[in-house]
Swiss-Prot record:
It is an enzyme of class 1 (oxidoreductase). InterPro entries: DXP_reductoisomerase, DXP_reductoisomerase_C, DXP_reductoisomerase_N, DXPR_C, DXPR_C_sf, NAD(P)-bd_dom_sf. The keyword NADP applies. Catalyzes the NADPH-dependent rearrangement and reduction of 1-deoxy-D-xylulose-5-phosphate (DXP) to 2-C-methyl-D-erythritol 4-phosphate (MEP). Mn(2+) binds at D150, E152, E231. NADPH binds at T10, G11, S12, I13, G36, R37, N38, N124, E126, G215. 1-deoxy-D-xylulose 5-phosphate binds at K125, S151, E152, S186, H209, S222, N227, K228, E231. The keyword Metal-binding applies. Belongs to the DXR family. Keywords: Isoprene biosynthesis, Manganese, Metal-binding, NADP, Oxidoreductase. It comes from Erwinia tasmaniensis (strain DSM 17950 / CFBP 7177 / CIP 109463 / NCPPB 4357 / Et1/99). Its EC number is 1.1.1.267. This is 1-deoxy-D-xylulose 5-phosphate reductoisomerase. Its cofactor is Mg(2+); Mn(2+).
């Protein structure tokens, strides 16, 4: 029986992880749950899975959860704050940690799990985007095991030789006969929207992904293809890939989740239904396989699979991320922080959809940071970039108001 801590249990990855636990109660047990403010959902999760601990980032939410669980006679100990999340990620009797807190907020708890030598199921791509080299050094020093959860990175992982799977972040692709890694992306809901209409797209339209069911922030990132850009950065770190060893292509059907191109002309792809329970179940059970609850892919019901090159005019955020990856860790940290502010402002209807990329560019142009040498420096860059983005927001909000 594997004991599990879930960081971000009330989000889409967290609930999918619990669905896999539910499908395999003889294999997995929940030791601890960590979430933000969703007391209603966390109460239900504690009632069903009876974890020893639950932590909320918000102190008031934790107090409300504590009262609700007491009324329900649930013995789960309730904690609050960032340190509690870090402590639960490093519990002695926890075997694996699902790192699924969205954004830079997930960095320190994920690092705590790494430093404790846990098997870390990495869904928080920002850990590598903001802290790639330092993160992988911590993995190496602690002998922790890293398994990717993002459908694309999990697909790549499954398409790699076993020797490479054991050496994430350090093995040579070239020495293993690999020419390139091919990241696929659907292109989001605005793939065919006329460019002149993009400024007028609403948050609800941006969150209506054609294939995947996701949270609102990642749905907007999919619409801008910033999500693919962050995955590009993450893939370079995870698989020790150069810019020349990376390809990004559009695949609207989201059936092929990513591919690996080999020197002999072979291309190995991982296919499946667009359901995050598949990569989650794979990582939780690796190197074995378990039931995920996902409907099998029915090839007889599939339409043709199509592919195309991404248009950077339509997806400037993708190009921004690729360029930031070449510039270094300070640039990727700055971009990630600016984007989180920009997406939150768009979801609050404060700026237009196309202002997300424009605000990201403005913050990158404003800041000039030295490469971080430790986690504190990364956090400082993140904080500075967020402040710069907040300071620039009124300019874009005024522009939106003048258009309405």
């Amino acid at each position: 029986m594997k004991q599990l801590t879930i960081l971000g249990s009330t989000g889409s990855i967290g609930t999918s992880t619990l669905a896999v636990v539910r499908a395999n109660p003889q294999l997995f047990a929940v030791k601890a749950l960590v979430a933000g403010r969703n007391v209603e959902l966390m109460t239900g999760q504690c009632l069903e899975f009876r974890p020893a601990y639950a932590a909320m980032s918000d102190k008031r939410a934790a107090e409300e959860l504590r009262l609700r669980l007491k009324d329900l006679n649930v013995a789960t100990e309730v904690l609050s704050g960032e340190q509690a999340a870090c402590d639960l990620a490093a519990l002695d009797d926890v075997d694996q940690v699902m790192a699924a807190i969205v954004g830079a907020a997930g960095l320190l708890p994920t690092l705590a799990a790494i430093r404790a030598g846990k098997k870390v199921l990495l869904a928080n791509k920002e850990s590598l985007v903001t802290c790639g080299r330092l993160f992988l050094e911590a993995v190496s020093a602690s002998k922790a095991q890293l398994l990717p959860i993002d459908s694309e990175h999990n697909a790549i992982f499954q398409s790699l030789p076993a020797s490479l799977q054991q050496q994430l972040g350090y093995a040579s692709l070239e020495n293993n006969g690999i020419e390139s890694i091919i990241l696929t992306g659907s292109g989001g809901p605005f793939r065919d929207t006329p460019l002149v209409e993009l400024p007028h797209m609403t948050p609800d339209q941006a969150c209506a992904h054609p294939n995947w069911s996701m949270g609102r922030k990642i749905s907007v990132d999919s619409a801008t293809m910033m999500n693919k850009g962050l995955e590009y950065i993450e893939a370079r770190w995870l698989f020790n890939a150069t810019d020349a060893q990376m390809e990004v292509i559009l695949h609207p059907q989201s059936v092929i989740h990513s591919m690996v191109r080999y020197r002999d002309g072979s291309v190995i792809a991982q296919l499946g239904s667009p359901d995050m329970r598949t990569p989650i179940a794979h990582a939780m059970a690796w190197p074995q396989r378990v039931e995920s609850g996902v409907q099998p892919l029915d090839f007889t019901r599939m339409s043709a699979m199509t592919f195309a090159q991404p248009d950077y005019t339509r997806y400037p955020c993708l190009k921004l991320a690729m360029d930031a990856s070449k510039a270094g860790q300070a640039a990727t940290t700055t971009l990630n922080a600016a984007n989180e502010i920009a997406v939150a402002a768009f979801l609050a209807s404060e700026i237009r959809f196309t202002d997300i990329a424009a605000l990201n560019v403005a913050v990158l142009d404003t800041l000039s940071c030295q490469e971080p040498q430790n986690v504190d420096a990364v956090i400082a860059i993140d904080r500075e970039a967020r402040a710069a983005a907040q300071a620039l927001l009124p300019r874009f909000a005024a522009k939106r108001a003048s258009v309405i």
